Amino acid sequence: MKENVASMIVFLLLLFLNIRLLKGQSPPGKPFIFKCRSPEKETFTCWWRPGADGGLPTNYTLTYHKEGETITHECPDYKTGGPNSCYFSKKHTSIWTIYIITVNATNQMGSSVSDPRYVDVTYIVEPDPPVNLTLEVKHPEDRKPYLWVKWLPPTLVDVRSGWLTLQYEIRLKPEKAAEWETHFAGQQTQFKILSLYPGQKYLVQVRCKPDHGFWSVWSPESSIQIPNDFTMKDITVWIFVAVLSTIICLIMVWAVALKGYSMVTCIFPPVPGPKIKGFDTHLLEKGKSEELLSAFGCQDFPPTADCEDLLVEFLEVDDSEDQQLMPAHSKEHSGPGMKPTDLDPDNDSGRGSCDSPSLLSEKCEEPQANPSTFHTPEVIEQPEKPKANVTHTWDPQTISLVGKMPYLSVNGSKSSTWPLLQPGQHNTNSPYHNIADMCKLATSLDKIDKDALQSSKTTEAAGEEKATKQREVESSHSKAEQDTGWLLPKEKPPFISPKPLDYVEIHKVNKDGALSLLLKQKENGDQTGKAGTPETSKEYAKVSRVMDNNILVLVQDPGAQNVALFEESTKEAPPSPSQNQAEKDLSSFSTAPSDCRLQQGGLDYLDPACFMHSLH
Amino acid sequence: PLKTWSHQAGSLLLLLVSNLLLCKSTASLPICPSGAVNCQVSLRDLFDRAVILSHHIHKLSSEMFNEFDKRYTQGRGFITKAINSCHTSSLSTPEDKEQAQQIHHEDLLNMVLRVLRSWNDPLYHLVTEVRGMQEAPDAILSKAIEIEEQNRRLLEGMEKIVGQVHPGIKENEIYSVWSGLPSLQMADEDARLFAFYNLLHCLRRDSHKIDNYLKLLKCRIIYDSNC
């Protein structure tokens, strides 16, 4: 009994297990017909996708019926199209007819039917790709070579009878290129490609499309190597052309670099800056004094021998306050203003005159030995000490006006520096000087003079020392140096003496522009100053040294007599800081750089510009 | 269209002399009874033009159907009802290539004529009815208008071809009568839409048929089945 119960229980258990296993199976899922295609509009194939098979082997059947018929057919061929397919042969294919196709999936548990698919073969035509793709490079005479592409329609398609009309498309690319180049070929089965890169390997593909259907897939690639077209001769020609053009480019660049500035100025002329009428700074800088002055309508400068009479000018400077300056007139002085009133009203550019009321009052009223009371524009010369026969040489270079009052240094007061007139400020005609500047200087000088007088009444130096300003006008055609010659006033306080003042007379101006100064023998001075006997006059042509700033010590050429005098005077000077300074300067100047010496016509000139540079 | 065809006929005399010299090897055509050489040339032109027209008509019809379906009847399964509902199905036209190749070219030409004639009336009404639709779709309407015009032209050309290929014999003008007009004018929107759908579906099919037949005929007649 118990054994039976046990076996019963086992049996039941096994039964339960079997039942459970059986419950895991299910009828198949619904299949789905996903594609039907006809390659030539004479046959077609449908493919389906099976649903879940439910764990059991499933049988699929395809059934269909046609439009206008009631008979249901089954798929004639399950094999040709592959798994899960149905192939309809010619016999079973009708065009312009709707097929209603369904697929049955059956398994042990059950079956399921797919949704019917309505298929009209007319609209599902998709041919195979074309076949026999051949490539050939043709080299016709007198023409560029081209690629000739040929192919044949797919084998199944009947084009001859006109049942299907195909249109073709080819594409090609160089092997390494990324993009295809597509060409529509129409209904022809050949194509010529003209634009090719020589030496490249090309890949070509072709596909086709029926008149009312789908494009086929691309055919397999065909490749061809394009022969290199360029002959050695062509390459040589191109290399030659490249080299030639490179050379031309380099030449052009070089020419532009050299002449670039002039070309640029030719195209874009520089905008002229404001100019004083008739005055050209560039000429001034270049030392073309003649041209510069000619712009003003000046006479030649330096004055020739004819102008000697012009230069007989001198100033009498007296330490007495009462004494007036008596400007000497040159006879043939042409040009503006010997006197303030004679100023040429038209030629007033930049040139002040003592006519100006303010200046006039200041200068003309002060009878002090104001060396700056200049009426004669030619040369302002300071009467020197008895020994101060100074000849200065015109250094016909740039105009500059610098002067200094040596005795100021004695007083400890600051030596005033004559305002440095820039070349640009000299808009006067040669040989006229800038009266206004002169007057200003005169006024400043006056003040200084007054101070000096006040401080040291004992000294009569007030009138003695004058800063001589020398203006030098550009006269010569010589270019180059912008030397400034200085007329010396250098005298220092040591030179102050109670002696009566001496006058230095401008004797003449040499042709080479050297001023010859004469020590005035008489009180009245030699007015005309015609070429006096040179023997009696001492020519001061040598610059011994430069004192302070901008003061040249001119020395009589033949002898060192005056030099000695000067030097003594220097030593006598009461020491003062500035004096020491001046000594230092002198000492430094005495060893003036030899290169500052200029040789010109037997006369030694020191280029003050050198000193200037060393000073400043 | 009428002018074009008459111009063609008028040029026959002009071409006569030149064609005598130029025409050499062409497909020997038994279809020009008078034996005039110019017959072939003009026939070729006629066929070329006919094929161009038929191809164009089918292309337009296909586009029109697709647009209509997409816009109005997509997913509504109208196709299931449009089975065997074309009025021209009574015309026994060949259903595959073998049948078409077996039929004689004259009969095939006649079939083309019959189908073309059968569509005169429906196309005319299609235009008027599409115009009357609310929100008349411009694309569909313009295509309908053009199809109607081209169809008329094609019909004329085909009659000329038949006159050349088969002169003298004038067959009865057989065609299928279309009676779908009331359906197009139905009040029921769904029924009306289906009527349109059906009409366009049939138009697409028949235009394809005509195109296919004419291409077959052209290759057979002009190129001796060697297209």
UniProtKB/Swiss-Prot annotation, chain A:
Disulfide bonds listed in the record: C36-C46, C75-C86
Domain Fibronectin type-III positions: 27-128, 129-229
Compartmental location: Membrane
Spans within the Extracellular topological domain: 25-234
Annotated binding of Zn(2+), by residue: D211, H212
Cytoplasmic side: 259-616
Xref: InterPro entries: FN3_dom (IPR003961), FN3_sf (IPR036116), Growth/epo_recpt_lig-bind (IPR015152), Ig-like_fold (IPR013783), Long_hematopoietin_rcpt_CS (IPR003528), Type-I_Cytokine_Rcpt (IPR050379)
Pfam families with a match to the protein in the record: EpoR_lig-bind
GO biological process per UniProt: positive regulation of cell population proliferation
Membrane protein topology class: Single-pass type I membrane protein
PANTHER family the UniProt entry points to: CYTOKINE RECEPTOR (PTHR23036), PROLACTIN RECEPTOR (PTHR23036:SF86)
Assembly with partners or alone: Interacts with SMARCA1. Interacts with NEK3 and VAV2 and this interaction is prolactin-dependent.
Identification of the protein by name: Prolactin receptor
Gene (name only): PRLR
